[in-house]
Amino acid sequence: MCIRDRGDGYWFLDTGVPHYVEFTDDLEAVDVIGRGRRIRYDKRFAKGTNVNFVKVVGPGHIAVRTYERGVEDETLACGTGSTAAALVTHLAAQPSVTAFRIDVRGGRLGIAFDEPKPGIYTRIRLSGEARKVFEGSYDTANFQS
């Protein structure tokens, strides 16, 4: 995993899917849908990217709001986005912390990881409640092969 400080206010990494991470002091003031959509389709990210806005609440505690590509909207929680936010917070602001409490719109998540060498992350663990938020059906007669 390559975590890059882009030097112009954001970090970029891939936690299975690409994530843009930007810190903010006022998470509620961020236009997650408007800004998220612009960043998601920015030419710097040829295949698009998920967009995470992060507020550091305290030691080992962050809050995250995520605009998810594919969903094309803000989501209640994003596991790979919360992982990206925790790793970037560790690298940029809290190098001694390897377990984070993460507040998301849908509740609370936990991310923990090992760092056997600086910048090398292993045993990344995500915890949190899983809830059914939608039910639907697909008519496969309209699918094309």
Model-predicted segments: where are they?
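Active-site proximal loop and beta-alpha junction motif in alpha/beta enzyme cores
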Residues: R4-A77, A84-S145
